[in-house]
UniProtKB/Swiss-Prot annotation:
InterPro entries: RuBisCO (IPR033966), RuBisCO_lsu_C (IPR000685), RuBisCO_lsu_C_sf (IPR036376), RuBisCO_lsu_N_sf (IPR036422). This is Ribulose bisphosphate carboxylase-like protein 1. Unknown. Probably does not have RuBisCO activity. It comes from the Bacteria. Gene3D superfamilies: Ribulose bisphosphate carboxylase, large subunit, C-terminal domain (3.20.20.110), RuBisCO large subunit, N-terminal domain (3.30.70.150). GO terms for molecular function: magnesium ion binding; ribulose-bisphosphate carboxylase activity. Belongs to the RuBisCO large chain family. Type IV subfamily.
Length: 368
């Protein structure tokens, strides 16, 4: 890695026009040497390490886009230190949002990005072109066999990928070591009935040792997908597990991602992809979360667009969407997408398989 290269970071800053130049300089210092320039006596540090304000542009009466360049030498290709340099102390300042980052080519090469990406997931499902479907096992409190029964019925309806709800972990009522084999068995039975591939994504969580033990169970059961919550397990642990999950699709869940003032398209679309997410879940607008259409489009674009040599990451809109929005969703995202419908399917009760079949049929018919 060329340590003379610089990382370009874009922030959005709330400030009065007369104050923005000074505020931008303070931001550049905070995210680099973090001390008064009078304390920086070595000229090389002043020339190379101190952050530089590269551009300031208004985006509102009292809001500005500020581009700062940081020395790549301060941020080795390690998730924690990279994010620390991008937004560490400044994340505590309420007037600043981390909007985007432009990395030198050595960073994507070092982090690696998705191992399988969209094409890898499509290959596992035998679905080369159409949009994909997903659902979730819930609620918390169900025993392993009850969750397995839900998975079986969803799979009989043809749902491509069935994941644990993010609230289901390694709890007493549904221990990972009991739940995963039960659901995997139910999925195998449903796949045999339908003569098609459908996938189960267990939620891998806990300490690094816990997650490694859980990965062993996933492999033993012959599963192809895991789900992790990067902001809960830690970005460094997420990246490490994504690398160790050789041959597995890695699905990233956005839990806790709203606690930071980081633009969703950057965090869920770009950074999760950089660290190894093959697919990224996020709330679609109009559901029970407050994302806008512009945010959702930017996020999906960040996940899928050409970016260095990284494989694209599949957008997975979710969050309170229902079958009656399928046409709208596919018109918005196109076919390189997985629509994740959970609660509104499960509410069908005894008609769960029939509703799942309607969901998958409507998605499959799009564009025909």
């Amino acid at each position: 890695m060329d340590m003379s290269e610089r990382i370009i970071v874009t922030y959005q800053v709330a400030a009065a026009p007369a104050e923005i130049a000074a505020r931008a300089e303070a931001l550049a210092i905070e995210q680099s040497v973090e001390c008064p320039l009078a304390a920086v006596t070595e000229q090389q540090i002043r020339d190379e390490i101190v952050g530089r304000v590269e551009a300031i542009a208004p985006i509102g009466e009292t809001r500005f886009s500020v581009r700062v360049s940081l020395a790549s030498a301060t941020a080795p290709a390690e998730p924690g230190q990279l994010l620390n340099m991008l937004f560490g102390n400044s994340s505590i300042q309420p007037d600043v949002t981390l909007a985007d980052v432009e990395l030198p080519p050595a960073y994507p090469a070092a982090f690696g990005g998705p191992k399988l990406g969209i094409s890898g997931l499509r290959a596992k499902l035998g679905a080369p072109r159409r949009a994909l479907t997903g659902s979730a096992l819930k609620p918390q409190g169900l025993a392993p066999e009850a969750l397995a029964g839900l998975a079986h019925r969803l799979a009989l309806g043809g749902v491509d990928l069935i994941k644990d709800d993010h609230g289901i972990a390694d709890q007493a009522f549904s221990p990972f070591a009991a739940r995963v084999p039960a659901v995997a068995r139910a999925m195998r039975e449903a796949c045999a009935v339908r003569g098609a591939a459908m996938l189960y994504a267990p939620h891998v969580s806990g300490s690094l040792d816990d997650m490694r033990r859980q990965l062993d169970i996933v492999r033993r059961e012959g599963l192809s997908v895991v789900m992790l919550m990067p902001m809960i397990v830690g970005l460094a642990n997420f990246h490490l597990i994504a690398k160790e999950a050789e041959g597995l699709i890695v699905l990233a869940h956005p839990s806790l991602a709203g606690a930071q003032r980081i633009a969703p398209d950057l965090l869920l679309g770009k950074l999760f992809r950089l660290l190894g997410a093959d697919a990224t879940i996020f709330p679609h607008y109009g559901g029970r979360f407050a994302y806008t259409p512009e945010t959702c489009r930017a996020l999906a674009d960040a996940a899928r667009r050409d970016w260095h040599d990284l494989k694209p990451c599949l957008p997975v809109p979710a969050g309170g969407i229902a079958i009656d929005r399928i046409k709208e969703l596919l018109a918005f995202y196109g076919t390189d997408v997985m629509l994740l419908i959970g609660g509104s399917l499960l509410a069908a009760g005894e008609q769960l398989t029939e509703h799942a079949a309607r969901f998958t049929a409507e998605v499959a018919s799009h564009g025909q």
